[in-house]
Amino acid sequence: MRDISKYEAFELSDQLVLDVYRVTGKFPKAEMFGLTGQMRRAAASIPMNLAEGAARAGAKEFAQFVNVAVGSCEEVRYQLHLAEALGYLTRVEQQTLDGKYESVKKMLAKLYGAVSREP
């Protein structure tokens, strides 16, 4: 079992979740079960999958969970775009969160590469 708190991808994705919760709190109430809920679930899925994967015994299993986290990360990116297009996020908010998304994505790619090379 791995200590997930030692992975930068986990720390960065955890921060992204908190940021997504903050900005979606300002979305229209009508979006609570739409974009707000979906965006929160997708963002939270990133560190949750990392945590679950880290608890698995083998590197192959961990790599699969990291890969799922990558998919959730891409989902969040589109949702950020959509939220800006709908006027729920300002351009500055979207760009700030997109920059954080990019950092998470890079760290996930690095982690996936490292875990995939483990025996």
Regions found by a protein language model. Name each.
Residues 1-119:
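Short, C-terminally biased terminal segments at protein or domain edges
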